[in-house]
Each structure stands twice: as C-alpha cells, then as structure tokens.
Amino acid sequence: MREAMQLVPMVIEQSSRGERSFDIYSRLLRERIIFLNGEVNDTVSALVCAQLLFLEAENSKKPINLYINSPGGVVTSGLAMYDTMRFIRAPVHTLCMGTARSMGSFLLMAGEAGGRAALPNASILIHQPSGGFQGQASDMMIHAEEILKTKQRMTRLYAEHCGRSYEDFERGMDRDRFMTAEEALEWGLIDRILTVREGEIPD
C-alpha cells in the first residue's frame, strides 16, 4: 500500500528527437511550479530551497509558483524556505490548494505581494509556534525563551506581510484560528481567491 501511494505519474513528450519521459514534478518544475505537499521538515525544506535557487538561476525575473497543501511542521525548516523565498530575486507567487496550516500558512502569506492566492475551498490555520523539551529546569527555561522569541518574530512577520497590527496577530494566534479562503483574504494572508484559471472567462 505504501509503495502504491508513493507512485509518481510519468509524462511522455514527443519531440523531433523522439520521446522523452519525465516524472510529473520535474515536468511542472519546467513550468516554474513547485509543490509543497505534506509536512514541513528538513528534507522537504532542502528540496524546495534547491528548486527555488535552481529556478532563480534559470531566470531571475520570471515568477515562480509555489503550490501549498501542508499541515505545517518544523518551524526552522519553514523559516529556511521563507528566507530563501525572500532572498532570491525571482518573485514567488503562492497558492493554497487544500490546506495551509501553521508553517504552511506562514509560507502562503510570504509570497510576493499581489501574488498570494487560495482556491475557494482552501482551509488556512494560524497559531503560535509550539515545542517540547525535557531536561534540567534551567535548560527548559532557555528553550521556553527561544520559543517565545520565535513566536514574537513570526507574529511580527505575519503583521508586516498582511498589513495588520502586531496586536491583531498576537491575539489571533493565541489559539488555533481556522480560516476559510474568504477569512484569509480579510486577514491579508492572501490577495485573491481563484475561482477560474487566470486568463479564462467563466461560463
């Protein structure tokens, strides 16, 4: 069962040189589309950062599209992706399809201003970072202080990217806050809700 779930579709293209096959993600990468699908961790972060850097090297002006369907995960892994998104010169447009929770929502709102979107039935969650530690009391206090610093840093970044006050997000992230696409738009996490593909005229 696990092997079946890990199957990746292949795409076959015809050219003057014959047939070429690509896994679907490599083919989409050629279209400057990166998928963040699943938990945020060091492995996923390394892959996404590498793809961002590769696409910037190919064209530093053309937008990169980051499609997000993630329950969140490791804060430091997410911050590595955030910093890379902000570091490269190519603008990164973000789109939530499915869910963007915790660090997933953080990366969603970190996209280029005007280029952050969600599909109509997307679910977005913001909350304060969490962590656990066992050990001596003095070490636990050090880790608690570090978590508090991370919370303050992330709250400030949410406020800056979303155009709201620090206090708004401090209150909003005190507990789990689930949002519809419409609520995420109101909070400034996204700039628009996509109901049709851009450039298409609805029936």
From Swiss-Prot:
Q: Which GO terms describe its molecular function?
A: ATP-dependent peptidase activity; ATPase binding; serine-type endopeptidase activity
Which SUPFAM superfamilies does the UniProt entry name for this protein?
ClpP/crotonase (SSF52096)
| Gene3D superfamilies per UniProt | 2-enoyl-CoA Hydratase, Chain A, domain 1 (3.90.226.10)
Give the UniProt entry's GO cellular component terms: cytoplasm; endopeptidase Clp complex
**Protein name per the record:** ATP-dependent Clp protease proteolytic subunit 1
Q: Gene encoding it?
A: clpP1
* Family statement drawn from the similarity comment of this UniProt entry: Belongs to the peptidase S14 family.
> What is this protein's function?
Cleaves peptides in various proteins in a process that requires ATP hydrolysis. Has a chymotrypsin-like activity. Plays a major role in the degradation of misfolded proteins.
Q: Organism's domain of life?
A: Bacteria
Active site as annotated? S102 (nucleophile), H127
Subcellular location(s): the record lists: Cytoplasm
